């Protein structure tokens, strides 16, 4: 989704007013990037608000903020050096300043339709504060969901363990709040590497934050910016119902040229659409997971020229059957064909598909992280045991007993004129120690 906006699309209307509560370094960076999203809507250039909560004072200096009026920073005083990847410290810091944080939430998010708690799982501040932030919003009846990044396998063992520990706690209580959007850092990192092979390593963070912000912003535009072609559409109120659905939320997007959409031979483009649905924008979803979804929707956007030719009964029927096949047990699954009357000339031939699927189980990626933790621990134990045994074997083989040396026998001297013995009253030389 990132990088696919046209200037005209940025003039569209947003469906829902989002607030972002950023926790820790990663969460604050994502929240700030979401608040940086611009539109050309009159009196609403920056439609989103963010509150950034962190311990380490230096982290705030790394965050670019385009409109200070839409972003509030809360420094957790007394913890300026950070939480050192210790979630207990992050939780303690949040609890100590919870009153101040909640007062800011009331002030900044009073008119928000939905709040996203953003957090990079695995660290200290964000991971530690996450459960307390959930409790705070839940107890005060806010509509909210979670926007969480999953660590890559290359992260340290402690990071992986911190992340899985929090996911387990969240899973036990996920029916109490709205959707969970998971961002697989491993997936985004591979995408960045493929698209930017010569880029510097430190450019990835900026790329991923913008990618996440664009994905959420674009789907929020689609549901409110274009002209419905038929009586069936997916509006802002339905989008609100979807993101308020407990469980994991998957976003997907596919762009095809109109000549790739042969309604008489639909297998080709339906296969591509199915792959896009499973791959997702932010994390991969398996087909079996999609089948357990609670809600789904598919929006289609194209130019007026293509809409008049494409949106026939046969095509829309194929779309309905496709979504029914992929998400058979959902409560609702609207198919919404839209017309973008402001399509740029170069995009007149493009057809864009957007899907949202809610109420999903935790993805296989979480299981993969647990497997990675198990592998690291087993290999570490084997390595330590092997090294320890090698040292012990040497120690046990080492003979540290000292045998008493016999005095050397005096050489005989039968010379013609033997020298007279001279008494030596000096003390014997002390033997040096050798360890």
Curated annotation (Swiss-Prot):
Belongs to the FtsZ family. TubZ subfamily. Its EC number is 3.6.5.-. Consists of two domains: a nucleotide-binding N-terminus that hydrolyzes GTP and a C-terminus domain necessary for polymerization. The domains are bridged by a long, central helix. Interactions between the C-terminus and the following monomer drive polymerization. This is Tubulin-like protein TubZ. GO terms for cellular component: cell division site; cytoplasm. InterPro entries: FtsZ/CetZ, Tubulin/FtsZ_GTPase_sf, Tubulin_FtsZ_GTPase, TubZ_C. It is an enzyme of class 3 (hydrolase). Transmembrane segments: none annotated. Disulfide bonds: none annotated. GTP binds at residues 25-26, 124-126, 185, 209. Changing residue 125 to A: Abolishes plasmid replication. Retains about 6% GTPase activity, forms very few filaments. Signal peptide: none annotated. A tubulin-like, filament forming GTPase; the motor component of the type III plasmid partition system which ensures correct segregation of the pXO1 plasmid. Essential for plasmid replication. The filaments seed from a DNA centromere-like site (tubC)-TubR complex which extends to surround the TubZ filaments. Highly dynamic filaments grow at the plus end and depolymerize at the minus end, a process called treadmilling. TubR-tubC complexes track the depolymerizing minus end of the filament, probably pulling plasmid within the cell. It catalyses: GTP + H2O = GDP + phosphate + H(+). Residues 403-435 are annotated as: Disordered. Keywords: Cytoplasm, DNA-binding, GTP-binding, Hydrolase, Nucleotide-binding, Plasmid, Plasmid partition. It comes from the Bacteria. One of its GO terms (biological process) is cell division. It is found in: Cytoplasm. GTPase inhibited by GTP-gamma-S, which also stabilizes filaments. Disruption phenotype: Loss of plasmid replication. It comes from Bacillus anthracis. The gene is tubZ. One of its GO terms (molecular function) is GTPase activity. Polymerizes to form two-stranded filaments and bundles at higher concentration in the presence of GTP. Binds to the TubR-tubC protein DNA complex. Its main location: cytoplasm.
């Amino acid at each position: 989704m990132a990088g696919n906006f046209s200037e005209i699309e940025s003039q569209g209307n947003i469906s829902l007013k989002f607030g972002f509560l950023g926790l820790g370094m990663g969460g604050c960076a994502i929240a700030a990037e979401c608040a940086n999203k611009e539109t050309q809507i009159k009196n609403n250039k920056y439609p989103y608000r963010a509150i950034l909560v962190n311990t380490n004072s230096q982290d705030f200096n790394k965050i670019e903020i385009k409109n200070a009026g839409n972003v509030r920073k809360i420094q957790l005083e007394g913890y300026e050096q950070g939480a050192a990847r210790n979630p207990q410290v992050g939780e303690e810091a949040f609890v100590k300043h919870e009153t101040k944080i909640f007062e800011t939430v009331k002030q900044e998010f009073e008119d928000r339709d939905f709040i996203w708690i953003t957090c990079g799982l695995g660290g200290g501040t964000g991971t530690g504060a996450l459960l307390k932030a959930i409790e705070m919003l839940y107890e005060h009846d806010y509509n909210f969901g979670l926007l969480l990044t999953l660590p890559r396998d290359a992260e340290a063992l402690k990071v992986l363990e911190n992340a899985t520990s929090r996911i387990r706690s969240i899973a036990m209580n996920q029916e109490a709040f709205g959707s969970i959007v998971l961002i697989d850092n491993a997936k985004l990192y591979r995408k960045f590497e493929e698209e930017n092979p010569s880029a510097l390593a430190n450019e990835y963070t900026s790329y991923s934050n913008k990618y996440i912000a664009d994905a959420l912003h674009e789907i929020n535009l689609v549901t409110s910016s274009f002209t419905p072609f038929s009586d069936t559409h997916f509006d802002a109120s339905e989008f609100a119902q979807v993101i308020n659905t407990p469980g994991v939320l998957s976003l997907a997007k596919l762009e095809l040229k109109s000549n790739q959409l042969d309604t008489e031979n639909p297998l080709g483009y339906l296969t591509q659409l199915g792959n896009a649905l499973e791959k997702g924008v932010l994390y991969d979803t398996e087909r079996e997971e999609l089948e357990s979804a609670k809600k789904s929707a598919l929006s289609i956007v194209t130019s007026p020229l293509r809409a008049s030719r494409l949106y026939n009964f046969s095509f829309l029927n194929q779309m309905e059957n496709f979504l029914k096949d992929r998400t058979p047990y959902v409560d609702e699954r609207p198919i919404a064909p839209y017309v973008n009357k402001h399509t740029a000339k170069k995009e007149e031939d493009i057809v864009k598909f957007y899907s949202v699927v809610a109420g999903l189980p935790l993805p296989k990626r979480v299981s993969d992280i647990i497997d990675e933790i198990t592998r690291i621990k087993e290999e570490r134990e084997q390595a330590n045991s092997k090294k320890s045994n090698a040292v012990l074997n040497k120690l046990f083989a080492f003979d540290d007993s000292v045998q008493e040396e016999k005095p050397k026998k005096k050489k005989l001297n039968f010379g013609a004129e033997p020298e007279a013995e001279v008494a030596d009253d000096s003390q014997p030389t002390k033997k040096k120690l050798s360890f």
